[in-house]
Amino acid sequence: MLFRSGLNEEQAKRGGLNPKMFNSFLDGSKPAIESTAVSNATGLTPAPDGLAFPPCSVEDLPFVMRPISEGGQLHHKGQVEVASSLEKDGRAIPYEIRKGVWVVFEASTEYQKNCFEEYMLQTDPSGRYSVMYKRWHLIGLEVGMSVASVGLRKEPTGCPIGFHADVIATAKRDLKPGEMLDGEGGYTVYGKLFPSEKSTGLGSLPLGLAHNVKLLKPIKAGQSLTYADVQMDESLTAVKLRREMERLFAPAAAKIAAQ
């Protein structure tokens, strides 16, 4: 498992990695959390069924990360998605972007399309989709710049502009009533990316509240949990804040469905 993430056991020990946090990258929880942050800060939206993790090299990003209707694998334009560095059979993809960040963009005019060609950008066959990327996201080094930017210039690296996406607790295995959920990176649940309209409409249980709570109902592996499935302490500050956020920012259609 460590190898699949690009680290070996010695490197993990040297870095003092938290096993649960580390596992949250491998089980899909952390990609869902980060995609939610991007979605809520930009207005890009998730696919109805969340992340698909299509296998993709850097060169193939403009081909794969475009709508299905145009030959790609995305549900719609303006979607958040994560590229897998492994093929479905476990084979490593050469020149992958496991540790990096990227954005695929579309030319909106013929002039822009011509610029892609003239500047020799990597594009899809139509010449309209291209990509910008960094193969390495230097997390520990970059966070200091964000802190300084906020403190000195009052300028955030990113902040929410709306409630577009959510991360919902989903069963890793069949769960029985009475079991205690152990949260992000644990043995019981992982986080799945949901459109916020879907999550709030269903009364879904956020991954962030799925720690040290008792299960009230049997849950099948792969089933996403709801508030009704667990014994939730409504007096907790985190629960109160989440409920307030849902009241204030949930899409109108979801509020009606939840009533």
Regions found by a protein language model. Give the residues of each.
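C-terminal catalytic/substrate-binding lobe primarily of soluble NAD(P)-dependent oxidoreductases
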Residues: 10-257
